């Protein structure tokens, strides 16, 4: 039964997603896309681009996946898996590609000759979104499952890229510094301080970042996570004060 409707749903979602992405690249996301392509982008730019990719994917799925068109008005797991997974894999491809371009060109400018690692298979992260959408019988609940969780997962795709490349560089003897900046807009704008995020704010060694969950984020979190490969002539003497000492 599901096989009869899912191919058309997938086609519609992917078509809408690509349409959204062309608009992102040509309009609101143009400066980000071309800054990356021209080698002028920062990690903050790629993070913002990942956010746009998430919004493009979220919009495409919400436009097409209507419970009125599904058997029994229900988002059965089989349908969720067959429709959500393909577009989110495409989202991962967009983010990972641009992330690699930015890091490679940033390394070149700094004279660093280090290999770039593509982020690991995103199946586990995508499965979490499928879990939230599966079984929904309310359009509002389904749309909610396809909004913040999808956008946050797109950002996590980039977080994973940064984390895995930091781990690689650390294994090669480079000193990696993780910086997390609190988002005072977005989900947190005008609301109470998010203590969960504030606990992870600041500058961390890579080891401490892993221990304290600095690479993690909740749905709707727009905190900026950056990873820097330290210059060999710099040494951080006190991680708790976030102060640098130049040698």
Where are these regions (language model features)?
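Domain-core detector
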Residues: 1-218, 226-247
